[in-house]
């Protein structure tokens, strides 16, 4: 099926991916997000491509960097990264589960962030993060790569709760200040 199609497009349809980036730049985007969303080893393992994640992650960055060079050399490239594994669709994870998953997230995000930093992106963007522990692991791991980190938190409710019940204010309190935008 279409599982991980965006990761595979980085090598199978690189020109199309680059064109999408250039289209965003043409209409005034200052930042483009590399097509890294499905390029983590855990997600690619689900389709038998886990050992090829570095190739796909590099290709995603190369596509965005080429598009920037062709379309607007002053634009920024953010390496978008999804949570390394599918987060359990449950609320109230135990503290032990949160720590175990947080450690796993940290390791995978750190490795991915080092790779994309070496490629020359300007910022790392962990996207679609649903739990505070996962967000903290992602931001801390990506910061180790020496790049600025933006983070995308998914499904923030009007009452300030995150998708699985954590409170956004608790996340903000962890760093004291965090700029944010909303999507999803």
Kindly give the residue locations of the regions a language model identified:
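Domain-level signal for soluble alpha/beta catalytic cores
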Residues: 1-184
């Amino acid at each position: 099926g279409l599982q991980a199609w965006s990761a595979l497009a980085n090598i199978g349809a690189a020109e199309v991916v680059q064109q999408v980036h250039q289209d965003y730049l043409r209409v005034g985007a200052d930042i483009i997000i590399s097509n890294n969303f499905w390029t983590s080893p855990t997600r690619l393992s689900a389709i038998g491509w886990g050992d090829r994640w570095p190739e796909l992650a590099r290709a995603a960055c190369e596509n965005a960097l080429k598009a920037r060079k062709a379309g607007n050399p002053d634009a920024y490239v953010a390496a978008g990264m999804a949570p390394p594994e599918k987060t359990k669709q449950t609320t109230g994870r135990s503290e032990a589960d949160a720590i175990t998953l947080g450690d796993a997230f940290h390791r995978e995000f750190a490795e991915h962030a080092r790779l994309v930093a070496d490629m020359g992106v300007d910022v790392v963007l962990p996207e679609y993060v649903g739990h505070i522990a996962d967000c903290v692991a992602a931001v801390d791991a990506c910061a180790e790569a020496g790049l600025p980190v933006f983070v995308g938190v998914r499904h923030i409710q009007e009452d300030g709760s995150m998708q699985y019940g954590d409170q956004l204010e608790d996340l903000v309190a962890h760093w004291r200040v965090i700029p944010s935008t909303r999507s999803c």
